UniProtKB/Swiss-Prot annotation:
Residues 1-18, 90-96, 144-158, 230-292, 363-371, 423-433, 490-528 are cytoplasmic. It comes from Medicago truncatula. One of its GO terms (cellular component) is plasma membrane. Gene3D superfamilies: MFS general substrate transporter like domains (1.20.1250.20). This is Low affinity inorganic phosphate transporter 4. The chain crosses the membrane at residues 19-39, 69-89, 97-117, 123-143, 159-179, 209-229, 293-313, 342-362, 372-392, 402-422, 434-454, 469-489. It is found in: Cell membrane. It catalyses: phosphate(in) + H(+)(in) = phosphate(out) + H(+)(out). It is a multi-pass membrane protein. GO terms for molecular function: phosphate transmembrane transporter activity; symporter activity.
Amino acid sequence: MGLEVLEALDSARTQWYHVTAIVIAGMGFFTDAYDLFCISTVSKLLGRLYYFDPSTNKPGKLPPSVNNVVTGVALVGTLSGQLVFGWLGDKLGRKKVYGVTLIIMVACAICSGLSFGSSAKSVMITLCFFRFWLGFGIGGDYPLSATIMSEYANKRTRGAFIAAVFAMQGVGIIFAGLVSMVFSGIFKAYYQAPRFNEDPILSTQPEGDLLWRLILMIGAVPAAMTYYWRMKMPETGRYTAIVEGNAKQAAADMARVLDIEIIAEQDKLAEFKAANDYPLWSSEFFNRHGRHLIGTMSCWFLLDIAFYSQNLTQKDIYPAMGLIRQDKEMNAIDEVFQTSRAMFVVALFGTFPGYWFTVFFIEKLGRFKIQLVGFFMMSFFMFVIGVKYEYLKDENKNLFALLYGLTFFFANFGPNSTTFVLPAELFPTRVRSTCHAFSAASGKAGAMVGAFGIQYYTLDGTPRKIRRAMMILAFTNLIGFFCTFLVTETKGRSLEEISGEDGRESELTATPNDRAPGIRQDSRTEKM
């Protein structure tokens, strides 16, 4: 029982409109990544500027509680935004709320840089307030961008298109390092200062207060540039037809987009909707889709514990790898420069390639294999780093950097990408955005465990604690490896076939062997 508008979307050739959709949705993730990760390049500068205590003979450092809130509050906002906008995306439509997320991101990125106050505490409170709402807007982009790209794409290249949107996160991380490096390089040239061990007071340039504000505010630029084009996108044909029940409008919108003639099938649509009218909170939904929802939520939760722990604590790992000097050997702005340069190098050679390997291979290898191998390799490399941490830190920094980079590579050519793709494919249209939001919010809950738990535990940088943290993260990834068996391969099939909306056998009733990629492909055509 297929609708012509859905079949047209599934069989459409790849054309310029698909590329445009990738860029528009992807630029949101570029902004998301920049805003979430640029804080890592300036958090030590905030400590030097606002929390220097001359009696310690050490550079100022954010207190553990303040550091956790500054770096983690955006994650709390992101989780909230995912749930709210994911639900709204199903209730009101993807397009109606898509522009709101961008407005919030632009406004709060600018306001983060304008954080004010007469004391260190008041500045941090203001900064955290705006970064919470920045995260709220960022969170809304997760389910909406994934769902929109999933519903626009054809079934042959859908995974690659969704992964390409998410891969812009890698570009955003690189850009966060690059912008911080360029701006701090300019400031370092114009506002020279002695190192901390030469003059603790003069080593912190007052101009650094302008530097961190500029770095945070730059995040508003790419989001603002795409607002017009985001508002020009029509509602997805699947939402218009299946949820709103307007076959005529769906056919007209998609005919204009795909440049083909599509017949509106209103009578057939009524039959289609009647067969798929069970609510989200029902036993029928959980019988059909509960295992997949548990799988996507648990895998994303476990992945983000490790992924965000690494990203948010890498500024503390870099000195151990020899990528930057010890803090006493630098002035405040030089520390920003060296931290951002190290972040840029690791992202360019470790983080960025993994995203695009997923884009190029996801339709060949499938989501299941990529996620399985990614979790396993992350667990292996983190285990090696944990066991040999002192040796790597003291005697083989090059190997340390290689292993650390490989964990990022296999995170992104692995579960960091596939946990974003799978929830956009596994669930019915009328709850797709909400289910993606549940999965993404579960991931952000894991990120908060990393930000508030692992980061707090390793904040003092003692080798024993970092070693233990790496071992914990290795075990976490191993659990993610086994949780992957709760999801199924979606490669090469329509969204309606995967979710059972077309009346065929739901994947949730398939045997465990059917879940493995490349096995019993003939089961796709079996009837209930």
